[in-house]
Amino acid sequence: RERGLTLIEILVVFGILALLMGLAPVAFDRLRESSQYRDTVRTMLSQMRSARQRAVTEGQEVRFFVNLRQRSYGMDGDAPRVLPDSLTVRTVVAGIDLTGEREASIRFLPTGGSTGGSIEVQRAPGVGTRLRVDWLSGRVTLEALMQ
């Protein structure tokens, strides 16, 4: 028998390659969504901690906001960042649950405290993180959402 591949072997290889190429976009989308989620949570956490530090250092109130209508967030004095479409955001400030049309804000005070509140960032139902701001200390902590 001569060395080489039969037609069936070549077709099997092409079939496997086609299957892998069909799965690649799905895997890429999941990877992109996961990356956007981690980046958004990390940036929110960093900006909230910076807002607290700036309030204490400069001796004046600094506001961190989430605009639910425009799907953006940020702190006073910085350009707002856009929330990716793949993420769902829910905020609770001053005991009021805001999920729709309004802008929520947490104010960091020169004393180190804040008005308190929490921001939940979800990438899929039940998968997410809550950024909680303690009203007394102004400390920002992360909690996994359990549903």
Where do the language-model regions lie?
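N-terminal helix-rich module
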Residues: 1, 11, 19, 23-57, ...
